[in-house]
């Protein structure tokens, strides 16, 4: 990737809520082409959201403004970083688009296709750029894409992605007693913030397909050259965690994909518990071409670290040479400059949302379902 012009004035960025993970605005702040200007959210939000927003603002020594319209009207900025609860992603991004601001937004784009379409219409109407956060610049994904683009394994025929996170999500399934109330989804997500396993934070319960499915589906979208998933067949289950079971969402799923150009694909995804794997989880690509095949571990390159009195829950394996977040920020800057296109734009992320929704419908119906692509 060519670098952006470091001589240009940095873009000023407003942070529209940072109540889930803060990796997105941190990555933007770490890039020399961006400066964070403020954090903002609506004053009507619950207290826990204000506490998280204020904490981030204090760390970066920028103001926290409890009024989005006021923040946008009184501060001259070029772009926004959007990282609230997933159910609010599109609401905040539409406000930014209508203000003529470029957008980098956390995943998933939304849990509703109508919200995705509303955002896309606003982006196209106001001619702004939108990058949806992803992991497509991991070293292993770059290597996999190079193997396909170079025709080293011939024409791409089929690919599979294992995407298992070996993380806990509260009490294990079967641990509740007969008179116990169902676990409240939001309460559980608030508890999970300390260890970063609250990707599904919000009022609406979200299964692993909705929370993390964008990652493997974005891999597949990139590796197939942007081909659309046309039809899916899926199985989903609450297999590991009581909170998922109580809220009728999946923590384990398999999806078979029929993709444009006669390509077949599949993915297996789950939040499978910390005891299930010595590393963060089994995340692997299996790619079959007309002249050969390859298996690529998403975590590589990595090193293993062991030392005396090491905390038992500390991951022993550490990824190295991982510039994914920096390269995403670089891609965003180049896209604003008009020198590049987002590696995952809002239409592609919307179609991934459509694939997830079709998969959930397929699991409910027990039959293949067509994907409603845009």
Task: Please annotate each region the language model reported.
Residues 60-122:
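Beta-loop-alpha module in the N-terminal Rossmann-like domain of NAD(P)-dependent dehydrogenases
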Residues 31, 62, 186-190, 275-277, ...:
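C-terminal glycine/acidic-rich active-site capping loop/insertion
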Residues 1-7, 79-81, 117, 333-374:
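C-terminal helix-rich "cap/oligomerization" subdomain common to oxidoreductases
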Residues 1-59:
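N-terminal Rossmann-like dinucleotide-binding module
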Residues 6-7, 211-300, 327-338:
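Contiguous beta-strand/loop segments that form the cofactor/metal-binding neighborhood of enzyme cores
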Residues 19, 138-245, 366:
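Predominantly a Rossmann-like dinucleotide-binding segment in NAD(P)-dependent oxidoreductases
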Residues 66, 105, 130-132, 160, ...:
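Hydrophobic residues in well-ordered beta-strands that form the structural core
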Residues 118-135, 155-159:
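Rossmann-fold dehydrogenase core element
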């Amino acid at each position: 990737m060519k670098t952006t012009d470091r001589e240009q004035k940095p873009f000023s960025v407003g942070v529209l809520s940072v109540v889930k993970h803060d990796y997105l605005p941190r990555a933007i702040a770490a890039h020399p082409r961006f400066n964070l200007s403020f954090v903002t959210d609506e004053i009507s939000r619950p207290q826990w959201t204000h506490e998280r927003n204020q904490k981030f603002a204090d760390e970066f020594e920028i103001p926290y403004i409890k009024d989005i319209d006021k923040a946008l009207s009184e501060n001259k900025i070029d772009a926004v970083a959007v990282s609230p609860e997933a159910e609010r992603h599109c609401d905040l991004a539409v406000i930014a688009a209508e203000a003529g601001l470029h957008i980098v937004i956390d995943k998933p784009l939304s849990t509703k296709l109508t919200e995705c379409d509303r955002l896309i219409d606003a982006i196209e109407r106001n001619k702004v750029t939108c990058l949806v956060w992803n992991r497509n610049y991991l070293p292993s994904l770059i290597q996999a894409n190079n193997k396909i683009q170079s025709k080293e394994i011939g024409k791409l025929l089929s690919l599979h992605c294992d995407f298992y996170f070996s993380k806990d999500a509260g009490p294990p399934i079967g641990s509740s007693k007969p008179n116990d109330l169902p676990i409240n989804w939001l309460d559980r997500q608030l508890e999970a913030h300390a260890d970063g396993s609250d990707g599904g934070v919000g009022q609406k319960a979200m299964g692993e397909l909705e929370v993390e499915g964008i990652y493997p589906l974005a891999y597949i979208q990139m590796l197939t050259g942007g081909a659309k998933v046309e039809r899916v067949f899926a199985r989903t289950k609450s297999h590991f965690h009581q909170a998922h079971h109580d809220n009728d969402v999946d923590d384990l799923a398999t999806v078979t994909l029929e993709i444009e150009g006669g390509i077949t694909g599949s993915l297996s995804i789950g939040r499978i518990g910390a005891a299930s794997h010595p590393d963060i989880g089994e995340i692997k690509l299996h790619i079959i071409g007309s002249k050969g095949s390859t298996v690529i571990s998403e975590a590589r390159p990595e090193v293993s670290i062991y030392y005396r009195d090491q905390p038992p829950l500390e991951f022993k394996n550490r990824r190295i040479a991982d510039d994914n977040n920096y390269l995403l920020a670089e891609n965003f800057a180049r896209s604003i400059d008009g020198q590049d296109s987002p590696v995952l734009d809002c239409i592609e992320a919307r179609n991934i949302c459509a694939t997830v929704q079709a998969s959930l419908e397929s699991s409910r119906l027990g039959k293949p379902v067509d994907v409603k692509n845009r």
